Amino acid sequence: MVTATPVKTEYEAIIGLETHCQLNTHSKIFCNCSTKFDSPPNTNVCPICLGYPGVLPVLNLEVLASAVKMGLAINGKIASYSKFDRKQYFYPDLPKNYQISQYDLPIVEQGSLEIEVVDKETKEVTRKTIGITRLHMEEDAGKLVHAGSDRLAGSTYSLVDFNRTGVPLLEIVSEPDLRSGQEAAEYAQELRRLVRYLGISDGNMQEGSLRCDVNISVRPKGQKKFGTKVEIKNMNSFSAIQKAIEYEIERQIEAIENGEPIRLETRLWEEGKQRTVTMRLKEGASDYRYFPEPDLPPIEVSQEQIETWKAQIPELPAQKRTRYETELGLSAYDARVLTDEREVAEYFETAVATGANAKLVANWVTQDIAAYLNNNKLNIGEIALKSEGLGELVNLIEEGTISGKIAKDILPELLTDGGSPKTLVEKKGLIQISDTGELEKIIDEVIASHPKELEKYRSGKKNLKGFFVGQVLKKTGGRADPKLTNQLLDKKLEA
């Protein structure tokens, strides 16, 4: 009797993200209190954000402008009429025992965001469009500081800082179109790029300016019905988002394979132990008892106002990437790296504006300068070499004034001290030797000094040509024109 081998079930993950973006307005969403991040506890508060009786909130119009700009950036439909609602729940960091949010009439619906997923091995870029269900405005809650634990459970006592209460948030809810931890992390990064390009948030996950909750379920591939959804919280980096999802996918598949039920719950990501743990059973929307906010009027936005705010939106990352590829001839990978931060893209473009070759400038920015920034933990705005200086350096190479090797040799000094590359080259006497007669004389001296190597070369060891090139460069301090040196050596070594 032959026993049939069980067919292994293939599963797919169904993932959606709820992203909270803290806006960088100077004052809170419904009062004039400061939004400064590192103020002493409970100093940026007033009767409005603390929910005292008899006070009335007033909408900060900068928050509305930011919401509309972000809505346009994600290709969303801007509502001409929307409203605020009270979301009722009880927690120590919520002084009013309700949060002012938006429920059934959000400011933005039906958006989308294109993401690019990079293969780590091949650097190949794959594009995918993720649907966005809605974007709405709301106020942030306060912050709990736990003694003896990183969360309420297990702490000996907790303190409440209400400075964050009333800080404006945009909540962006994706469709369940994501299928992996890598896709989810890239989606979150693309949102951060957008808010930074728009100038509405710093998108700093470590400071809580960008916070993501993951909703995830798994199901057999080909099945239409969704599995039981689990929410994951407490991820403060993009790598944590990816790792938490990858762990949770494996956990849910293992549970299903073992015949165990998946509970509708909220789980926490424990960075130290690289796992998710149960926090609480999941609440449904009905538990919040939403009803219209009686102290705020409905929000009406005219098409004229939308057009005014639209005109203030800069060229966004996806638009820049397309332009870099189609107009400048850059690879998808280089275009992606250059547009990751707005400051880097601006640095690159200003360098190219000097007339420098775009591909060469891209190579310098994404390789040598990027390595320097990473090694020294700097932003591109903190280096002394201005973008015009990089353009000048690339032009010196293109014109044959200096070699690429000389450029690399002087780059560290330019990055720390700045100044004109041309002036530095002239001062140090590093101008490339491109005169045929002068180079021939130097090559003749090198060949005459190495008769044994010459004999071996002419006996068939052609790889010794590299030795002679090196000797010429050494004798000239790296100033010999590499192309001309190779041409002259070919001629003289075979003579």
Swiss-Prot record:
Keyword ATP-binding: yes
EC number(s) stated in the UniProt entry for this protein: 6.3.5.-
Keywords, sorted A to Z: ATP-binding, Ligase, Nucleotide-binding, Protein biosynthesis
BP-aspect Gene Ontology terms: glutaminyl-tRNAGln biosynthesis via transamidation; translation
An example Gene Ontology molecular-function term: ATP binding
Catalyses which reaction(s): L-glutamyl-tRNA(Gln) + L-glutamine + ATP + H2O = L-glutaminyl-tRNA(Gln) + L-glutamate + ADP + phosphate + H(+); L-aspartyl-tRNA(Asn) + L-glutamine + ATP + H2O = L-asparaginyl-tRNA(Asn) + L-glutamate + ADP + phosphate + 2 H(+)
PROSITE patterns cross-referenced by the UniProt entry: GATB
HAMAP family per the UniProt record, alphabetical: GatB
Reported function: Allows the formation of correctly charged Asn-tRNA(Asn) or Gln-tRNA(Gln) through the transamidation of misacylated Asp-tRNA(Asn) or Glu-tRNA(Gln) in organisms which lack either or both of asparaginyl-tRNA or glutaminyl-tRNA synthetases. The reaction takes place in the presence of glutamine and ATP through an activated phospho-Asp-tRNA(Asn) or phospho-Glu-tRNA(Gln).
Stated family: Belongs to the GatB/GatE family. GatB subfamily.
Subunit and interaction comment: Heterotrimer of A, B and C subunits.
Cross-referenced PANTHER family: GLUTAMYL-TRNA GLN AMIDOTRANSFERASE SUBUNIT B MITOCHONDRIAL AND PROKARYOTIC PET112-RELATED, GLUTAMYL-TRNA(GLN) AMIDOTRANSFERASE SUBUNIT B, MITOCHONDRIAL
Protein name: Aspartyl/glutamyl-tRNA(Asn/Gln) amidotransferase subunit B
Organism placement in taxonomy: Bacteria, Bacillati, Cyanobacteriota, Cyanophyceae, Oscillatoriophycideae
Gene name for this UniProt entry: gatB
